[in-house]
Amino acid sequence: MTNPIEVPDVSIRIVEIQREEEVLSCHFGSVSWLVGTGIHLQASRLCWRIPVRRMRWRYYEFPKDGLYMAPDVEDIPVQNDRTGFQGALSSHAFGIAASLLAFFGFAGVGGGCMERHASLLCVLAAKHAETDLIRQAIAGYID
């Protein structure tokens, strides 16, 4: 599947690697162990009603070495405790939001790889059909 979500001018592909460690180490090297845990923690912050760690997660790559993770489910209820926002995001929008929170949270770690991934993911989020919902979900967590 070349473009599993509708994002204008962005080509995204599903990573077919079966093991989390393999795909994360390709993108994040020695700090890869932080990324999966960080994204799952941020996902739990956004959706504390559902055990997101137990969901099946997929890895998505886009040009220029970007990567994000998203659960393989339908819409996910989210709540932002800092702003009071409540809503639902598609799995891709949810994964983008959780990944952004993790990458920004780890800024300064990994020799710039977190910042690079956050920057690329911001471009994707800005072109996503659920841009406003993603922004509302992460508002107050990222300065």
Question: Model features per residue range: what roles?
Answer:
Residues 4-51:
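Negatively charged, low-complexity tracts enriched in Asp/Glu with abundant Ser/Thr
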Residues 8-9, 27, 64, 135-138:
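Intrinsically disordered, low-complexity segments enriched in small/polar residues
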Residues 18-21, 73-77:
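Short amphipathic alpha-helical segments, especially helix-boundary/capping motifs
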Residues 20, 56, 93-96:
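Short runs of predominantly hydrophobic/aromatic residues within well-ordered alpha helices
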Residues 32-76:
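Amphipathic, interaction-prone secondary-structure segments
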Residues 76-143:
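Polybasic, proline/glycine-rich intrinsically disordered low-complexity segments
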